[in-house]
């Protein structure tokens, strides 16, 4: 007869390790958390300069983060510019409310404003420069570049915290805007005690003092030459004066 089963023996020696499997798919891009006085905002560490450095050298619309698209100028002055404002043909009205300027509006394939929240978050990450490209109705082109450009958050009314280090061919029409808070047709933050500049001059959101030597978000006029309504159009005073409304303008930023 067969006896009972005995106890199990000792474990054998471990076998050799198997081969490492193939690498998994890449994870999502990392994000930078910017902590402001009122809230914590998450914004991807992506702008057009980073895209340019990664090999994206064709100008066009790119995604900077969830729900945020911008036109990237990959050709002008070394490329890598994030366009925060553009006027081309008057197809998008810029007489908008505070909330619209806060969020941004328009189409990055054409005319648009990137949004004050986005502009603030970008320029708070690192030191940025600003380039303004201008074209009149005769096809002449000028530019203004500022080595330092920074916009404060909403708690400070999107103040133009820093704009300095001018160079270029258009004249320095934004020096008078430094330190001023952003105003819109429904939010009067200017320093003019007699007028609401955003309502009286061009109806566009801007950094008004009393009131401004530039207004790139004013009303879009065609065919009025040097006889446009004063301070109502797309104005760069040091180039074409305050009665001339420009045909095309763009504001673009890049870290340095």
Report the location of each language-model feature.
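N-terminal entry motif of extracellular EGF-like repeats
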Residues: 27-52
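Surface-exposed interaction patches
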Residues: 144, 156-217
């Amino acid at each position: 007869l067969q006896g009972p089963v005995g106890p199990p023996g000792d474990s054998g020696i471990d076998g050799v390790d198997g081969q490492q499997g193939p690498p998994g798919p890449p994870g999502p891009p990392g994000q930078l958390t910017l902590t402001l006085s009122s809230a914590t905002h998450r914004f991807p560490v992506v702008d057009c300069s980073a895209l340019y450095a990664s090999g994206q050298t064709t100008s066009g619309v790119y995604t900077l983060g969830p729900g945020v698209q911008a036109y990237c100028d990959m050709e002008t002055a070394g490329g890598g510019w994030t366009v925060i404002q553009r006027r081309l043909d008057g197809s998008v009205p810029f007489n908008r409310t505070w909330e619209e300027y806060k969020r941004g509006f328009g189409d990055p394939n054409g005319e648009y404003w990137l949004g004050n929240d986005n502009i603030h978050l970008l320029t708070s990450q690192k030191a940025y420069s600003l380039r303004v490209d201008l074209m009149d109705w005769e096809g002449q082109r000028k530019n203004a570049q500022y080595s330092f450009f920074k916009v404060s958050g909403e708690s400070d009314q999107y103040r133009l915290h820093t704009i300095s280090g001018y160079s270029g061919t258009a004249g320095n029409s934004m020096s008078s805007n430094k330190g001023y808070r952003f105003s819109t047709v429904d939010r009067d933050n200017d320093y003019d005690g007699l007028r609401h500049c955003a309502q009286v001059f061009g109806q566009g959101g801007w950094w008004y003092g009393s009131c401004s030597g530039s207004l790139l978000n004013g009303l879009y006029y065609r065919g009025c030459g040097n006889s446009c309504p004063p301070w109502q159009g797309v104005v760069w005073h040091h180039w074409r004066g305050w009665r001339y409304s420009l045909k095309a303008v763009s504001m673009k930023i890049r870290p340095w």
